[in-house]
C-alpha cells in the first residue's frame, strides 16, 4: 500500500532530490524514478574555524590515552550499548578515553551502564554543545554505532577534521561515505567485539589509517 501511495504522489513532483547514491538506486529500482543526487551542504571553513576555538576540557588532556568520541542523539537507533560494550573490552587492554556527546531519552540508560560496569573514569557523557567541533578536534577516533542512518553528516564533519572513522555498516550512508572501507573502517551492526578489535588495532596500523584519513579528506567534494 505504501509503495503505491508513494508512486501516486511522486508522479506529481517536478523533481525528486535525494541525498545519497543508495537512495538514488532505491528510487530507480523500487519506483523506476530518476532522481537528482544533491549531498547535504558542508561548510568546511566554518567547521575548521570552530574546531580551533579554545576549549578547556581536561578529560582529553592525557596525551598517552587513545581518545575516542561519539556524537549522536541518545536513542535506540544510535545503539550506544554496542559502543559501550566494545569500549568495555578495550579498557582492559589499552589506555583510552571515550567522550559521548548528545541528547535524548536514553541518556540515563547510557549512564547506568557506565556505572554498573565501573567505567566512570574512562567515559564522559555530556550534552550536545553549540560548538562540537573543538571537542571532535581533540579526539583520535570518531565512532558511529547506528543501526540505520540517512547520510550521517557527522562522518563528513569528522573527515573535514581528519579524524579516523570507525562506523557500523548500517543502511544507509557509512559505506558510501567511507568508500567501502577505503576511507575508514566498517563493522557489522551490533558487533561490539569487532568494533573493539578495530579500535585496539588503531595504533598498530597508523600508517594505513593516516592514508585512509588523507584519502577521505582529499576526496571531500561536498
Q: Whereabouts are the PLM-identified features?
A:
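Membrane-interface segments of envelope glycosyltransferases acting on lipid-linked substrates or membrane lipids
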Residues: 1-222
